[in-house]
Amino acid sequence: MTCNCLVAQLQSEASGWIDPSRNWVVTGRERHVAAARSGNVGYPQRAIRTEDFLYIVNFQPDRWPMGDPLPRLSDDLPTSEQLRQNTFATFADMDASPTRTWLIEHRSDPQAQRFFELAFGRRPKFELYDLKKDPHQIDNVAMQPEYIEVRNSLQKQLLQELRDTDDPRVVGTGETFDLP
């Protein structure tokens, strides 16, 4: 892992964008809860954020981002109490909570379906959000023709940074975090 010291920004009396040379950040995710998915595999993501855009690569889009839906969202769901109090009841990468419980219990309601999908649905391999137009990062514009140049530029920058820092998802087989 590499980083740059943030002490100057943390101790600064200024607010907002303090150091103009810091104009992007790379973040990553592998897992939140180890047993959220069969085989204890993670949900590998890497992202680059600039002032205007957030670009995300989901390395395994066939996996469930919030963990496997156990049971398979049949009619035989865990009770409300289990959903609220047991992280492992279903979608274990989202901690047990009233919000998670409500979303799961109302997943078939027409007004709640979109929110359920945003919270628990599978994600595409590439996501791009225009933060000026969509600050809440709801509308993925990665495949829209007018964003292809931005997407390609951010993808190139992200992958170069990951290679330069020997990120295990882009160096070697890319499976380091998935191996026991």
For each predicted feature, which ranges?
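C-terminal cap/loop subdomain of S1 sulfatases and analogous C-terminal strand-loop tails that border
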Residues: 1-127
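Long, internal low-complexity/basic segments
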Residues: 101-126, 131-180
